[in-house]
Amino acid sequence: MDLKIGDEAPNFDANTTVGKINFHDWLGDDWGVLMSHPADFTPVCTTEIGRVANLKEDFSKRTGKVRVLSVGTKPGLTPLESHTEWIKDVNETQGASVDFPLIEDPDKEIANSYGMIHPNASDTLTVRSVFIIGPDKKVKLVISYPASTGRNFVEILRVIDSLQLTAEYQVATPVDWKHGEDCIVVPAVPTEDIPGKFPKGHTIVKDYLRTTPQPNI
């Protein structure tokens, strides 16, 4: 399945390293990040999982819940045994304390429902997919990285900031925007309505390019 922005995130029941979950129930009214990694006990994936664990507070203050899925597990172990043993390595080598769930998907049902397996890359392992999902259970962002390239989680946090801001206010965020910087007033807002909606002030660069200080700080 090729999920697109605005599609409903497929729901699923799954076993994880912290017990069984229903994905939509777990999300509740929060934002969620669902990621896939190619395989346990691999170098790039190990650094990624450690990085996410060390950014726990940054995700938490954005009410961003994290779930990680893997279909590549260690031979001789069940998927959950593989995940659990690998977490020990992640904690040891990355100075981390992984406490978010890793999902087992032995039949690749979840991976296929999210389009995480790209046959031109590998027909058995997932690519490095990222799905940001809103409280309405709709997909807000989709990114796919090749197996050779680790993800930039600072960028993922930046996108969550932008998505949460623009879900509440009639603004967009410009190139390289970071939390605390000026935003763009969306074209749907008439210029004469800007002072009432954005009392912090605004700047008219062009009639189609109006900026305002970030409204929620």
Locations of regions flagged by a protein language model:
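Chalcogenol-based redox active-site neighborhoods
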Residues: 1-217
